[in-house]
Amino acid sequence: VLSAADKTNVKSAFSKIGGQADEYGAETLERMFATYPQTKTYFPHFDLGKGSAQVKAHGKKVAAALVEAANAVDDIAGALSKLSDLHAQKLRVDPVNFKLLGQCFLVTVATHNPSLLTPEVHASLDKFLCAVGTVLTAKYR
């Protein structure tokens, strides 16, 4: 559960990430595919090479979902309801992959903004990303 301080940290971090969110989304996917090659199985039709237009386009979608969730941090489930339905009914992505994606996102943020990721902000973003993963897999039953 995100505390009031966590919510403030998440909103503040995403306001600073701002214009780079799409870039970070693509870099996060590239990092995940390189670090956890098993995640590539969900994208058999993609060119997964560095700088791929398909990875950039999907990274933009990932970033948009994270920004939407951050902007609606009091109602992440409501903000991501349609995406949750998609993952539950069609995509069936193994839930562990959301944790892997979250870890890669944190590394990407830390790489570009080392001073932003204080221990408190890191913990808040980690809790937020876990909450996003929980929402995206909540309807898997």
Swiss-Prot record:
Q: Which GO terms describe its biological process?
A: hydrogen peroxide catabolic process
Query: What does this protein do, in the record's words?
Result: Involved in oxygen transport from the lung to the various peripheral tissues.
Give the family, as the similarity comment puts it.
Belongs to the globin family.
Read off the CDD domains from this record.
Hb-alpha-like
This chain belongs to the protein called Hemoglobin subunit alpha-A
- What is one Pfam family matched by this protein? Globin
Cite the record's note on assembly.
Heterotetramer of two alpha chains and two beta chains.
Residue positions annotated to bind O2 are: 58
What high-level taxonomic lineage is stated for the organism? Eukaryota, Metazoa, Chordata, Craniata, Vertebrata
Q: Where does tissue-level expression of this protein occur?
A: Red blood cells.
The answer, when asked if Heme is one of the entry's keywords, is yes
Name the UniProt key words of this record, in alphabetical order.
Answer: Heme, Iron, Metal-binding, Oxygen transport, Transport
Q: Per UniProt, where does heme b bind?
A: 87
Keyword Transport part of the UniProt annotation: yes
InterPro entries from the UniProt entry:
Globin (IPR000971), Globin-like_sf (IPR009050), Globin/Proto (IPR012292), Hemoglobin_a-typ (IPR002338), Hemoglobin_oxygen_transport (IPR050056), Hemoglobin_pi (IPR002339)
State any GO CC term. hemoglobin complex
Show the GO MF annotations.
haptoglobin binding; heme binding; iron ion binding; organic acid binding; oxygen binding; oxygen carrier activity; peroxidase activity
